[in-house]
Every structure is written in structure tokens, then in C-alpha cells.
Amino acid sequence: CVYQKPRAELGRQWAEVSRRIMALRDNPECAQAEFDLWNDADDPGMQVRVAFDPQEDIAAPYIASGARPRVAILREQGCNSQVEMAWAFDKAGFEALDVHMTDLLTGRIRLGDMQGLVAVGGFSYGDVLGAGEGWARTIRYNDLLSDAFAAFFGRGDTFALGVCNGCQMMAALAGMIPGAEHWPRFTRNISEKYEARLSLVEIPESPSIFMQGMGGTIVPVAVAHGEGYANFTQQGDAGQVIAALRYVDHRGQATEQYPYNPNGSAGGLTGVTTADGRFTVMMPHPERVTRNVMMSWAPKSWGAADQGGSNAPNGGYTPWMRLFRNARVWIG
């Protein structure tokens, strides 16, 4: 042996410069917390637990019927991921429509014709008014739009999903969403920077129509946001809110520890829902990880990253596809 040192010691030497830069640029406590992970020699790495059969396509009977309920994939200037979102809902048996806010403002498309509404991620208006705030105000302070959204939310046969920027936007509209009065606002990450990671999350038991049958599942998901901290100082009630998703560490425990929890929310909270389950918002991006080929890492049991065809385990789909199929089953 020419050279021999413990892996943790070499890792700390390698990461020291990055730690110093991060401590100057971002939250120094988070910089130290990430650096200290090198001291955990027993870290098992990401541990996945799927509490359902991901090979079962529960939406198949509804797809076979030929009926395709309409879902609006809503976006605003600066949004993204609408293509991945539309693809996932299309595969789950919906007719996914690309809807820009100008389509609603001009009357080209009506929410009254939709059964589902999905607000996608991104950075509407560059987040200059606060993440999702400008988008929400476009709705709140326009009589045509506020009436249309209130009517849509008030119908008993509709659902809505907000992801990332859409989560921030819908949280800012909590006052007009039935059952969302306990939702927080989502504000700047504790790390004081934009976080783009593959993070481990647990899906707790909840009434969310999107998460039915998934309770107890722990899976990786894409994260990409700068303002994901669940902030109850501005609105909401941490004691009453219904969790739909939370960050966990590599031992499966809900955590506030950085970087397992990239935004620092108490109890790992990163997704909430309503008591009837029709409305759910979350900061992570399930639409970006619905297939093996979209994953930067996945368990070998899911198939290799380049196995995306029908011969791959689960047909090339990850367990996240169940979220979209659940919505189709709920519509019936």
C-alpha cells in the first residue's frame, strides 16, 4: 500500500475548502452540518421503503374506459416543469391541457371546464415579489380570476395540486381554498440559498387523494427551490396542519438536519393537504422522477437508469407514478 488514510479523514480534507466558501456565502451552521456528515461512519446511505406494489397500475380500468378527465397544467411567466407534469397526468389517464395565466385572463380557457388544476414549479415573475406571491396576487386582485378560482375550489368534484412554485402560490391563496386555513407560507430556506438535490422523503398517512395507499413509503425525490421553509409565523397553525410529505434522514427519521432537510422546516414538513384531501401542495418535484431514466440515483431493484422501457422493473416507472394514478382513481 502506497498511501492509506480513513475515508472520512480524506473526505473532510477534500470538502474543507467548499465548507469555508459555503460558510462565507450561505448559512455557516448549514455549511458545518453538511461537513460534519463525514464523521458519520455508519451512515447507511439512502434507504428506500415502498409500502405498495408499484407495478400495479390502479388507473388501468379507468384508462381502458376511454374517459379522459381534463386537468389544467397551469403556468405563469417564469414557470417550468409543465411538460413533465403534463406527461405524468397524460400517462395516468387524463387529458392534460397546457394553460397559461393569459388563457384564463382572456377567457380562452375556463376553469369551469376542468376537473383538475395543477400549478407547476419554477420562478414566476423571478420571485421578485416573494416566491409565488406575484402569481397569487394576479389571481387574488383580479375579480374575474378570483371568482373563477373560488368557484373551482368550491366544487366537490375537483382537485388541485401545487408543486414548488405552485405550492408557494397556492399557499398564498390558502384563504380561498376550503380546508387550507392551517397551511403555512413557504419562505427562504434556512440554508439561505437555492437547493437542488435528490432528497429522501416519507409519505405519512393522510387524507390526500394523491397519496392514498402510499402511507409509510420512503423514496427519493427531486428538490429545487430557494424558498421552501414552512413558515407559520405569517399564517397557518403548525399544530393543526395536515402533513402530506416530510423529509427524513438516511435512517428514516423525520428530520430538521441539513442537508437531509434542505429548507429547515420543523418536523421535516415539505407538503400539506386538506381534511378532504382534494387539495395538496408540496415543495419537491414528483413529476421529475416518475421514470427510472429521470433519476440521478435509484435502488437497483427499480432497474438501471437506462432501463426505461416496458421490460424494465415496474415498466420503467418509479413509485411516484402512483401519485398521478391515484388522482385518476379518485375521479372514477
Task: Pin down the residues of each PLM region.
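Amide-donor transfer/coupling interface in amidating biosynthetic enzymes
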Residues: G107-I109, S146, A150-A151, W183-G332
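Short helix-loop-beta junction
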Residues: V83-V99
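Cysteine-nucleophile active-site neighborhood
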Residues: V120-S208
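Intein/HINT protein-splicing elements and their conserved insertion hotspots or analogous self-processing inserts
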Residues: C1-R70, G78
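Generic beta-strand/beta-sheet core signal
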Residues: L74-E76, V99, L117-V120, V163, ...
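Residues that mark the start of a beta-strand
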Residues: R68-R70, E95, P220
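Short acidic/histidine-rich motifs immediately flanking catalytic phosphotransfer sites
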Residues: R110-V118
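Short acidic loop-to-helix transition motifs that present clustered carboxylates
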Residues: V99-G107
